[in-house]
Amino acid sequence: MLRTHDAGTLRASDIGKGVTLAGWVGHRRDHGGVAFIDLRDASGLAQVVIRDEILESSGAHDLRNEYCIRVTGVVEARPEGNANPNLPTGEIEVAITELEVLNPSAPLPFQIDEHVSVGEDARLKYRYLDLRRPHQHEALVLRSHVTHAIREVLDRHNFYDIETPTLTRSTPEGARDFLVPARLAPGCWYALPQSPQLFKQLLMVSGMERYYQIARCYRDEDFRADRQPEFTQLDVEMSFVDQDDVIALAEETMAACWKIIGVDMPTPLPRITWHEAMDRYGSDKPDLRFGNEITEVTDFFANTAFRVFQAPYVGAVVMPGGASLPRRQFDAWQEWARTRGAKGLAYITISDEGVPEGPVAKNISEEEKAGIAEKVGAKPGDAIFFAAGSKTSSQELLGAARLEIGRRCELFDPSDWAFCWVVDAPLFKPTKEAEASGDVAVGTGAWTAVHHAFTSPTPDCLDTFDTDPGSALAYAYDFVVNGNEVGGGSIRIHRRDVQERVFNVMGIGPEEAQEKFGFLLDAFKFGAPPHGGIAFGLDRLVMLLGGFETIRDVIAFPKTGNGYDPLTAAPAPITPAQRREAGVDAKPKEPSGGQTSNAEAYKSTT
């Protein structure tokens, strides 16, 4: 063995023991013939003392930060007054008798120090150095503890950890696929899975009944600040269950995760319907750490002469103390709204005497001015922000304003936790609305799925969802923590006729459905059981548990917000030879039957 002990595990009880440690030089300090080194390994750090007789003979004078070294010595108590109560090893030091440099270090691109600010590009380019910083190291340790806790719960409930394919066929699931050329079938392509959705349903048909997987998923989306093209999710599926069964298991699993950080999750968690969440909070993932709910005032302004409020929906949210804001800050709110696609954010201020003032107040009636503060719950000194237009977009704008007000006015304690389930979301939404929000609409119909095409309608909607898609509800449930959607799932469709009806609403006809999803539809013919499941975003879960700023902090080797990897410089061009060999430009053969067949393409090569 290269070492006998881990540096961070030494305590006062080890005083007098001979030890051999190995790790990195964190800091070095020289004090008149004595050198002190903070020796760091994965367990923490210990102070190493190199005295005169060893200092000259060991080459310790040449040591620099991040040299990899091995030392042998004796654990001693630190001199009186030199103990460090902020360090687990702060009562001891190791007086060394031998020192060996295992590997020197080149000059560092940045200091391995929590207190030094480092740009993200540099951190990701030298990620192996960034991970030596304790905070980043702890992120991956926490991630390991979380997956261990998850497995313990699911193992207790007799779940099977089963892998599903990484190379599969491209199927429309709501995002763009990453495609991989199939060299042995020129012109044909694999797709990396957006989720294990279809395979886990097939596992339920196969009789496995209880499946889970910590699965890698891939989505070729337009990159956003806190998204990754590849990510990890906890994927769970169960047969012969209803919504309550899945939620109960999910709560037990999540409670085990929060227990890691010393938080007792109160179960059962509250449930709120999707429509209630939108009406009260302007979000389908509401932050329940504070109130300050939005208020609909459409009826209040039903007879208004103010043209802006002559809209299908008018809503309001109060900013406590907002009347004292200078005009430039109200102008900044307008710009804030425009960055979210709105024309602006109308507002009224309530003076200390309770009189409505501001641009909107000049355009509404005396009766409306007299009643608006009471209607929305505003007090003297408050400001009221309004949104008017389509219901969904207006509610979303007010919901975003509510969150911004909560942060600016410190309406909640950032260390608090608020959990809930959002249930009974719409099964479908208009395709134009989905595309306008940047989503990929599956199918060519006027309606597309809100969650995915395999979500079952609620039992009450089973007979009417295709004749009245706008009123149909999904048998689905989302796990929300502090305004973050951490997990989501649903009871699945298990009957071929129901699945075909859903496809039809989405504009996926019988031939297309059979071509793209025939393997699933055919499986449903063989006694597919009722089943449901859930998936949790593991990256986001660990980020929240550890209080990290982005999911990149909890991924070992993440990519930037635009999908670039500074460490390996990926993605990168391929050579012309690779392109030819992979068949990137090849066209698939047309079989005699007319329909393109992967199977026939592969048969022609064997």
Curated annotation (Swiss-Prot):
Cysteine pairings via disulfide bonds: none
Feature type site, description Important for tRNA non-discrimination: 31, 81
Keyword ATP-binding included in the entry's annotation: yes
SUPFAM superfamilies assigned: Class II aaRS and biotin synthetases, GAD domain-like, Nucleic acid-binding proteins
Molecular-function GO term, any one: aspartate-tRNA ligase activity
Keywords: Aminoacyl-tRNA synthetase, ATP-binding, Cytoplasm, Ligase, Nucleotide-binding, Protein biosynthesis
Record keyword Calcium present: no
Pfam families associated with the record: GAD, tRNA-synt_2, tRNA_anti-codon
Basic and acidic residues biased stretches: 578-590
Oligomer and partners: Homodimer.
Listed name of the protein: Aspartate--tRNA(Asp/Asn) ligase
Organism of this sequence: Cutibacterium acnes (strain DSM 16379 / KPA171202) (Propionibacterium acnes)
